[in-house]
Amino acid sequence: MRQIIFHEETKTFHLYNEKISYILCVLENGHLGQLYFGKRLHDKADFSYLVEKCGRPMTSYIYEWDRTFSLEHIRQEYPVYGTTDYRHPAIELLQENGSRISEFQYESYEIIAGKPKLSGLPATYTESEEEAQTLRIFLKDALTGAKLALLYTIFDEYSAIARSAYIENAGEKNLHVLNMMSLSLDLPDKDYEWMQLSGTWSRERYIKNRTLEQGITAIDSMRGNSSHEHNPFLALKRHNTDENAGEAIGISLIYSGNFRMQAEVDTHDVTRITAGINPEGFDWKLEPGESFQTPEAVLVYSENGLNGMSQTFQKLYAKRLARGYWRDKARPILNNNWEATYFDFTEDRLVEIARKAKECGVELFVLDDGWFGARRNDRAGLGDWVANEELLPNGIKGLSERIEALGLKFGLWFEPEMVNKDSDLYRAHPDWILQTPGRNTSHGRYQYVLDFARKEVVDHIYGMMAKLLSESKISYIKWDMNRSITECYSSKLPSDRQGEVFHRYILGVYDLYERLTNEFPEVLFESCASGGGRFDPGMLYYAPQGWTSDDSDAIERLKIQYGTSMCYPLSSMGSHVSVVPNHQVFRNTPLHTRANVAYFGTFGYELDLNKLTEEEIKEVKEQITFMKEYREVLQFGTFYRLKSPFEGNETVWMVTNEDRTLAIVGYYRVLNGVNQPYSRVRLQGLNPDMVYENVWNHTENYGDELMNYGLITSDVTAGEVPGNVTPCTDFESRIYMLKGKKVQEGR
């Protein structure tokens, strides 16, 4: 049972549930102090033991009579700029006189049942007030009149704290918010390894680790989206922490725009974590009476290793961040035409591809880029969301009806935020793009970014998309974004509000998503940004799944999907079987390995099934039958990482159903070897007293045996090849089905 307690006599707040505690207090100068975040502690009135302070050389002090109280050496909850603390602040305000000094002092608090919604922003939520409690702490800067509210939500079921901040200009003069983090967390030591998920296009969310030392470790984006380069996620783990044991802290920012996450280790090994909107180029003007709300950040603690941390994020995000009709539904198996045809298609060819897909058991056919306006290549058409009648003489309405007549659902690709200069939209409204007066406007993929900070632009795109969705039988939307933002300037905003454009842009994206998902609640949205360039929690609030990466090669996907699973549920990962040679790395991998990787996600095909052999079609049908039978557990089960592709030639992961009567293990080996050692892997999450049948070889083992000795994964590479055994090759994989048969009682 979660609880929020305020001890009046010591002015200490204690938020706790069965697994975690979060403790903060009001310091003697009225600021908030950070005392503890971690494993559940017994509650008591006085935690002053956790406040460490002493006099230090070369230190500035608040009070002349107290040479122990300096903000430089006290752990704080939401530190301000420039008042005896030389570390990076959580908030920085520019006042009309040029000062950047603030002093937010405690005023009051309130405890709210459930969780309030954040206006205009994605955030975790509750479906009943009994699921969570929210603490709102009010602080005020007496000189400027600015009022600050810090929000903390603690959940019953999750080892997580959701945090955000809100500021109101209750004074008489303008303020400029130059920096306002979603959270700040001061930890008492630096004995952590920092983990980030980084990469580039088609190599997203690779796991990168480094040891924290004095100084700053940071990731960020200034691209206008969360980016391929750095995901808005970080983890701190103790040096002895592995996947299944040890302490880990995870921080995830529910935001899709420019962000910054950093760890700053000071001179005495205190670690300050901050996460929020990137302050670079950010300047939000607050006139008297105006307010600003930060995005939400989620803080997770695990004493059960990285798997424990990930499972908290995965379950919380699958159930209390993703929303709507599709949140809990098994996702349809789809066939996307992009790598099958690119821009070279006709209506009849699309129907031919869809017909074969239906024959194989596919449920959804998706028409990707190239169907609209003058779009015959990537230089024209974006912004004109009207069907090209030369390609589609019956329009989207007619095509969707033909697809549905086959017994399939129909999906469609959009890139709502972009425009080509060769388009009717640009010719009519050349001022609707983000562009800096007097400067060259850069393109990406020959396209330009619409100014979604302007309501009339968002309204126009909404009107075009809603018209198509209303008139046609569209069950799925793939929403793409194929370039980053440059020359960020809005002709609609005055000069003193240009620092707001990046954030206003992403608020416009959220607004369009919100309107479309509200009006068309049964349409399944999949987010995309040249693959995984905006694969973040903010998107998950509107689109319950995202295209994980444009790299669909099975071997490349091992690292991509392994890293992605650090924070995101399997139900959010778009994962497809594509053609060989693969179009990104030109590798040939077996059809079964391509499917064995793609099963652990939403599953689909990125090819023309008409071009497969009869034997391959038979295998595809078997794959689809398997996925339909087990997709509930594959998409919504409890996921465990067992062997990392970043550490060796083998990758192993597994998923279990809720009652642990079924486990599906994915085993993958990149390169074959000669006379290799015997191999096994210790499984996780099984019932130790249950007997499991291994469907692969019909052996039976207790759960404790499989978790302590392990599942034997040796094959013929461990010795000579018998005459009746097919030799293994490179890029080999196997799916082990473990079905619980009985529980042995009284052992």
Regions found by a protein language model. Name each.
Residues 70-118, 241, 245-258, 262, ...:
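Glycine-rich, aromatic-flanked loop segments that form ligand/cofactor-binding clefts
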Residues 234, 243, 645-688:
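Carbohydrate-binding surface patches
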Residues 19, 165, 289, 335, ...:
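Conserved, mostly hydrophobic/aromatic
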Residues 4-14, 32-264, 280, 691-705:
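Polysaccharide-binding surfaces and accessory modules of carbohydrate-active proteins
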Residues 326-463, 476:
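Aromatic-lined carbohydrate-binding/catalytic grooves of carbohydrate-active enzymes
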Residues 671-747:
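C-terminal beta-sandwich/jelly-roll accessory domains of carbohydrate-active enzymes
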Residues 99-106, 284-303, 731-738:
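Short Pro-Gly-centered flexible turn/kink motifs
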Residues 420-459, 503-610:
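Glycan-recognition surfaces
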